[in-house]
Amino acid sequence: MKILSVFLFVFSIYIFGHVSGTGIRIVNELKSHKNLWMRCYSKNDVIGPKIIPVGYDYVNSFRANIWGTTRFMCTLKQRPNYRHYQNFTAFKQYTAYDNGADWDWRAREDGIYLKKEGGLKKSVDMNKVYDWIN
């Protein structure tokens, strides 16, 4: 009976994480009609490359794993010549209980901004996280 109780507890945590929203959103807020080149990957998935026009976004919802190790890495590049770019961790699960977080990224002229909602860690208001690499 104890094993069944433990199984049901772990299973309910796992299911809860898959019911709530977990994902990344990347928004192109660049000026001068600059498209944004994007490619993201995790241990199991590759997204892109994709081109995001100014004013548009790309949303990827996914399921965080039960081990608490889900991570997405992304590369963003500004068009037309791709001189300005950045490689970064776009989503990181901190524990097996850390499900349901949305990481909202904004590509702007002066850098890349992040707003986090949900998950175990405190929500984060929009703030600049990365500068562009030249």
Curated annotation (Swiss-Prot):
Q: What are the BP-aspect GO terms?
A: rejection of self pollen
Q: Which InterPro entries match?
A: Self-incomp_S1
Pfam entry (one):
Self-incomp_S1
The compartments listed are:
Secreted
Entry coiled-coil feature ranges: none
**Glycosylated position list:** 87
Task: State the GO CC annotations.
Answer: extracellular region
Q: Where is the signal peptide?
A: 1-21
Keywords from UniProt, A to Z, are: Glycoprotein, Secreted, Self-incompatibility, Signal
Against PANTHER family, the record matches this protein to: PTHR31232, S-PROTEIN HOMOLOG-RELATED
| Similarity field | Belongs to the plant self-incompatibility (S1) protein family.
Tell me what this protein is called.
Answer: S-protein homolog 31
What organism is the protein native to? Arabidopsis thaliana (Mouse-ear cress)
- Its gene? SPH31
